């Protein structure tokens, strides 16, 4: 991965170190996060793009555990209700067209008391950054990511109980830990 990926690596490693049980990893992409996964886990990973998963295949093959990669849209998960113990996301919800529905979909497949772990960049309340993020969002929204989403609000509105929020870069980049209430 590039420079930005490297600087977030320790934070991702810490977040992903909590992986246990049946794990769903959302938006695997080209697999840049795989080297930060703990060893010997069984992970189901999805991405909307078959091409991305093709590129990820060498990283999937190199992983010490097992990664079952599937082409799937978070809005249309084909898994049974209560299928997973944990769900992990990494810079995903800036690109999900309907984040609230996506999070509700994740909650459906998460067992009661299951955990959601997120590494996300979100909108800022700090004035200079808020202005910059608003401007960047005007530009990037046309191309894809909306970096200015209120992800914390979406997580709550989807019915999750947030247990922890860690601000890694002001209030723009953060980790969120939440539970699917029983």
Which residues fall in each region the model found?
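Short glycine-centered segments of the SAM/dcSAM-binding site in methyltransferase folds
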Residues: 42, 113-115
């Amino acid at each position: 991965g590039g420079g930005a990926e490297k600087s977030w690596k320790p934070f991702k490693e810490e977040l992903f170190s909590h992986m246990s049980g049946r794990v769903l990893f959302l938006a695997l992409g080209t697999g840049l996060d795989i080297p930060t996964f703990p060893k010997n886990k069984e992970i189901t990973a999805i991405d909307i793009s078959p091409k991305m998963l093709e590129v990820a295949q060498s990283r999937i093959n190199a992983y010490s555990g097992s990664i079952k990669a599937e082409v799937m849209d978070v809005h249309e998960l084909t898994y049974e209700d209560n299928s997973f113990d944990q769900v992990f996301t990494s810079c995903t919800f800036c690109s999900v067209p309907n984040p609230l529905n996506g999070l509700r979909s994740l909650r459906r497949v998460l067992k009661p008391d299951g955990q959601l772990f997120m590494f996300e960049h979100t909108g800022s309340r700090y004035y200079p950054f808020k202005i910059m993020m608003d401007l960047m969002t005007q530009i990037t929204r046309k191309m894809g990511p909306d970096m200015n989403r209120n992800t914390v609000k979406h997580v709550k509105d989807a019915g999750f109980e947030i247990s922890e929020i860690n601000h890694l870069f002001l209030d723009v980049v953060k980790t969120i830990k939440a539970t699917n209430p029983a």
